[in-house]
Amino acid sequence: MSRGLGDVYKRQKLDNELNYNGNGCGALSADILLQPGETTTIAFVLGMKYDKEATAIMGRYKNPAITCQKELEELITFWSRRFANFQVKTPSPEFNTMINTWNAYNCFMTFIWSRAASFIYCGLRNGYGYRDTVQDIQGVIHLAPEMAADKIRFMLSAQVNNGGGLPLVKFTHNPGHEDTPDDASYVKETGHPAYRADDALWLFPTVYKYVAETGDLKFVDEVIPFANKEEGSVYEHLKRAIDFSIKRLGRHGMPAGLYADWNDCLRPVSYTHLRAHETLANL
């Protein structure tokens, strides 16, 4: 028990304060009076809807004990099915739970949110980071290959026809009709003034792992639009990602780092480029 939680018990009420950018938590309370041996169920239903929709949703919880139990069972069934594709069995139950449940759950959450809600971004980000999202796909390929394939297609459609990836893929992404870092309108809307060297190069390990896991060799022949114009097969998208790097070499003939953020000076762009060639050859 933390000191703060002890203080809440002493006060017997919450302060209704907003803790911005601190180590906060969400807390809800209710005043109830129970007779000896009596039980009750309290359901906290959280969400944001307009009045009409909210009223309809709240109407489903007139009997919270039954409704919540039913939804809990549905939730357990949902995640059990998601985790079923990969299960490890070792002499350690704790290790099994960590790998089979919590690691898998964290991979799904990262895949779904793509770091769009975090301490770093104060709960807000105006789109998907390209390499972040492509990297995060790898964590669920073995658990939900169909979800992974859909997200790969989405990220391929956020690749510009010059081979580079959009540094930020808007939540309203419209394949074939997007502005790019070459356009002042994109820079103004997203705040990203240039391409990054390695964004599209992360497609290589992700696509390769998907094909290796599923055996779906035809995937590389699927035709997908580019972000701004034109379309091409998955294989063509990968080729253009390599071309993007080849056309942007430094004075020593190695792939240049281009625009960077907080730790990009540490990334081995040339090595990533080399691995991209190797992966394309294997495909």
Regions found by a protein language model. Give the residues of each.
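Single conserved hydrophobic/aromatic residue that forms the stacking wall/gate
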Residues: 1-9, 273, 280-283
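Acidic/polar, glycine-enriched structural segments that form the non-catalytic walls/loops
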Residues: 7-16, 22, 27-127, 227-235, ...
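Extended hydrophobic/Leu-rich segments
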Residues: 8-12, 206, 269, 273
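Aromatic-rich carbohydrate-recognition surfaces in CAZymes
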Residues: 37, 128-133, 137-148, 152-255
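Intrinsically disordered, low-complexity acidic/polar segments
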Residues: 51-55, 213, 283
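Extended glycan-interaction surfaces of carbohydrate-active proteins
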Residues: 85-127, 152-186, 242-275
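Short, flexible active-site-adjacent loop segments at beta-strand->alpha-helix junctions, enriched
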Residues: 101, 207, 280
